[in-house]
């Protein structure tokens, strides 16, 4: 490695010495060599002798002019261009060359298939031209694009088209202008040949907005759902948040090569095609809902992210935590609130809690960063959203919306901080959030322990609630947090007991603010069954000694669907933990009859929402189960999970078959009622696949071949792979033959291959690196084959012989120079070595040491490896 990457610290923030108010860009486009001319209007705000330090990577400088005169007072350093002796106000003209075709990191301007496109967040604009590449520099952008008309008939950039023309040699040009000042991370450019779906949306003030969705030629029939989702997002943001769109045009472009999910560039969103393209035979129900959510997320950024942006990248959760909260609310308002909440909580418990316990632990507002791309994390996004949700819980919807309005009044058109947001919420609601602010600075997952006591003579019920946050890799000392802790108490008939104290009603959300607190309730006429941490009111781990009877009671009687699911999760957790210990001692699975009966009751409940029943019947993933243990035994977890599946499949075989048959649908609609029925039916099929082999094989094969939609086809295929049924290989081959030309559809197949429980799965994965549909230059393919193996097949990745680790080292060695961002995502399971036994730790450490010795190790990997080895 040439030099050790340097860390940046939040407390070192300084306002820039120069601001750029306007920038006029011209791109003379060519895949091999693009010429960029940047004309910036700059103003000095710092000391008179302060040089202008511009960021730039992989650029070839052609010329520099200041106020039209050639300028020689400059020097190039690694990653920077430093210009001296500048007047207070000036026009800076820089011409440079870049090569989009050579840009395999997919940051800046790069080639995706036959198109050219950009990705500038977080620090990609410096790969396009020299500039103040930081979010607190907001300029008005005008962009002129010149290109070959036959190769690139569509030339797109932010804002409205203001001019266009034809040139000789078959070239043409377009000029676009974005009237809203923005940081350069929101700049976008796309050039290519597309099919276009056009529509309009009339805002509540009567303005007509042109909507344009650009997809690869031949994919137009997969675009309508994304357009519907966009219009739903625009309407919802007006209705729920009072926020209206502000430009005359909104464009979305779907590209196949993309490091992230999607990008909210002002007026021109660039999307991974995974989150745009859907047709009933290519996309599952989950894909449809993910598209709706991600389209919503990027649209909602127009206000929370673009109109008000981040002062610096340490404040990333200001825009991302808030916008994830908004997209979760959007999905919940349009669909099932309980199912969406369950999905979010699965992510927190299975993935974010693991991040908190890893070497990369950080608060939602990090204090120290080496490579900013490494902080687009579950902590910043999902835990960030939980922190916003807690504010919403403490304030209520009305005060929260007042806080949002005040936030926009104060900060519209500027770059703000997390503190600015909390201050607006506090000022608008008169709720003191001073203690609550600690969530922004303290990392880790708090553990909340609850003990209760009931006195039948005084009819008093007491809860003693204590909290502690274990030390994390980045912080040894922890302080008590302000935890909104929601509860409900039930009597023996399933009625909710009103919470009272001293004759007054008590709010069901308890404010837990100390290391230990006691809450006493009066007039509790019966020993209650408590529902605790209702709706997952805070991102914490809960410890309470439940009896099986309490949990089965809540599964049946809790009035809140989330509480019913959560009780089932707790019941399963009890027996998973017990059986992992039994497995390690060589004993068989033990599952009491009443546990199977509790799940039978769910299947026989005619009033239950099928979508909720499906969630209750979906066992926690291996990653969720892992979080129940200090030291993770991935082999034991996989085997216990399978044994549990087989036991329930045998105990409830008749019920599973009956529910499977009764939920058959003839036609396919993306409708929440139908989605619930399909999800329940396919959850039953999953168990049936682990039952009697002949019946399983017949049912699964028949569903696969009769399916008129991808949801049912993939559910059958997935069941065949998970249960290793005789029909597996034939069905997998049929799928490959049918879809091998469609990368997105093949991603589902690659995931099934790489997460298979088969003994030879690693050998299979290695073979698939040469598959006709696989490419090491496409992030979606890499994530589906290599990422899913390392991250979602722990039993195989953590094989005793270390073969899984060695495989990942080989892949990361290739990706380190090819695409460091993707490499950095894939290394996550390897850096969590301290959660495993000594033998595995030793092998994982050796693998990390091997990577650390790579020549030209990227900053992205360096940061994670050094933290893991510390």
Residue ranges of predicted features:
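A surface-exposed beta-strand-loop module
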Residues: 45-112, 133, 512-528
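Hydrophobic alpha-helical and helix-loop surface patches within well-folded domains
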Residues: 176, 205-458, 462-463
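Extended, low-hydrophobicity, Ser/Thr/Pro/Gly-biased non-transmembrane segments
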Residues: 95-198, 561-564
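Beta-strand-rich binding/interaction modules
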Residues: 60-67, 187, 432-435, 445-532, ...
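Surface-exposed beta-strand/loop patches in extracellular or lumenal glycoproteins
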Residues: 37-58, 130-133, 139-148, 419, ...
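Short acidic/polar inter-strand loop motif in beta-rich domains
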Residues: 98-105, 470-471, 536-542
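Long, ordered, helix-rich scaffold segments
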Residues: 350, 522-870
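N-terminal, polar/Ser/Thr-rich
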Residues: 1-35, 110-119, 131, 135, ...
């Amino acid at each position: 490695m040439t030099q050790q990457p340097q860390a940046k610290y939040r407390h070192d923030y300084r306002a820039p010495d120069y601001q750029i108010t306007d920038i006029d860009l011209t791109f003379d486009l060519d895949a091999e060599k693009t010429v960029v001319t940047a004309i910036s209007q700059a103003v000095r705000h710092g000391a008179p002798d302060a040089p202008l330090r511009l960021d730039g990577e992989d650029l070839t400088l052609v010329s520099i002019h200041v106020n039209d005169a050639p300028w020689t007072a400059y020097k190039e350093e690694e990653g920077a261009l430093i210009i001296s002796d500048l007047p207070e106000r000036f026009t800076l003209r820089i011409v440079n060359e870049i090569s989009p075709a050579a840009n395999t990191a997919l940051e800046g301007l790069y080639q995706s298939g036959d198109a050219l496109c950009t990705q500038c967040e977080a620090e990609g604009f410096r790969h396009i031209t020299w500039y103040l590449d930081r979010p607190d520099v907001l300029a008005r952008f005008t962009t002129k694009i010149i290109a070959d008309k036959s190769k690139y008939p569509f030339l797109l950039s932010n804002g409205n088209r203001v001019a266009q023309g034809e040139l000789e040699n078959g070239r043409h040009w377009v000029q676009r202008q974005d009237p809203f000042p923005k940081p350069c991370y929101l700049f976008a450019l796309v050039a290519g040949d597309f099919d276009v779906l056009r529509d309009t949306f009339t805002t509540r003030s009567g303005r007509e907005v042109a909507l344009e969705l650009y997809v690869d030629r031949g994919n137009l029939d997969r675009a309508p759902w994304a357009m519907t989702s966009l219009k739903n997002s625009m309407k919802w943001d007006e209705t729920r948040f009072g926020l209206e769109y502000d430009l005359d045009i909104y464009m979305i472009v779907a590209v196949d090569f993309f490091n992230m999910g999607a990008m909210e560039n002002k007026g021109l969103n660039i999307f991974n095609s995974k989150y745009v393209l859907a047709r009933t035979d290519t996309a599952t129900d989950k894909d449809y809902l993910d598209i709706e959510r991600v389209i919503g997320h990027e649209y909602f950024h127009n206000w929370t992210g673009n109109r008000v942006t981040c002062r610096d990248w340490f404040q990333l959760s200001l825009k991302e935590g808030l916008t994830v909260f908004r997209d979760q609310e959007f999905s919940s308002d349009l669909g099932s609130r309980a199912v969406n909440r369950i999905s979010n909580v699965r992510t927190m418990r299975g993935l974010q809690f693991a991040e908190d316990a890893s070497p990369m632990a950080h608060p939602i507002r990090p204090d120290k960063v080496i490579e900013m791309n490494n902080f687009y994390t579950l902590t910043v996004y999902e835990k960030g959203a939980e922190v916003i949700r807690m504010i919403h819980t403490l304030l209520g919807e009305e005060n929260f919306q007042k806080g949002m309005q005040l936030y926009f009044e104060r900060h519209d058109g500027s770059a703000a901080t997390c503190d600015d947001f909390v201050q607006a919420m506090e000022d608008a609601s008169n709720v003191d959030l001073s203690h609550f602010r600690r969530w922004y600075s303290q990392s880790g997952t708090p553990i909340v322990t609850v003990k209760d006591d009931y006195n039948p003579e005084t009819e008093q019920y007491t809860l003693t609630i204590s909290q502690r946050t274990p030390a994390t890799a980045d912080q040894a000392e922890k302080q008590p947090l302000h935890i909104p802790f929601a509860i409900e108490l039930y009597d023996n008939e399933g009625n909710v007991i009103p919470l009272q104290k001293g004759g007054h009603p008590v709010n069901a959300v308890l404010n837990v603010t100390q290391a230990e607190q006691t809450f006493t309730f009066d007039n509790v006429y019966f020993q209650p069954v408590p529902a605790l941490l209702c709706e997952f009111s805070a991102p914490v781990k809960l410890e309470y000694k439940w009896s099986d009877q309490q949990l089965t009671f809540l599964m049946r009687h809790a009035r809140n669907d989330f509480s019913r699911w959560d009780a089932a999760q707790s019941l399963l957790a009890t027996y998973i933990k017990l059986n992992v210990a039994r497995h390690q001692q060589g004993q068989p699975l033990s599952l009491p009859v009443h546990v199977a009966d509790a799940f039978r009751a769910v299947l026989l409940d005619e009033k239950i929402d099928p979508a909720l029943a499906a969630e209750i019947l979906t066992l926690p993933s291996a990653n969720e189960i892992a979080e129940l243990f200090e030291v993770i035994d991935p082999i034991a977890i996989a085997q216990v999970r399978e044994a549990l599946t087989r036991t329930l499949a045998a105990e409830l075989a008749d019920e599973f078959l009956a529910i499977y048959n009764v939920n058959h649908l003839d036609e396919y609609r993306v409708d929440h009622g139908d989605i619930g029925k399909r999800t329940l039916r396919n959850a039953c099929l999953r168990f049936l696949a682990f039952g009697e082999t002949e019946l399983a094989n017949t049912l699964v094969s028949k569903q696969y071949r009769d399916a008129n939609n991808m949801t049912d086809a993939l559910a059958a295929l997935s069941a065949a792979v998970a249960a290793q049924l005789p029909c597996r290989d034939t069905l997998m081959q049929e799928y490959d033959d049918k879809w091998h030309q469609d990368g997105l559809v093949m991603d589902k197949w690659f995931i099934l291959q790489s997460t298979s429980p088969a003994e030879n799965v690693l050998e299979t994965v290695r073979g698939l690196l040469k598959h006709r549909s696989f490419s090491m230059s496409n992030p979606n393919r890499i994530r589906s084959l290599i990422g899913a193996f390392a991250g979602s097949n722990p039993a195989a990745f953590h094989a005793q012989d270390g073969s899984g680790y060695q495989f990942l080292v080989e892949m990361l060695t290739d990706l380190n120079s090819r695409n460091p961002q993707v490499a950095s995502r894939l290394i996550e399971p390897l850096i969590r070595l301290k959660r495993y036994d000594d033998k595995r730790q030793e092998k994982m450490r050796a693998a990390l040491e091997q990577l650390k010795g790579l020549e030209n190790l990227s900053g992205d990997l360096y940061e994670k490896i050094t933290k893991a080895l510390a």
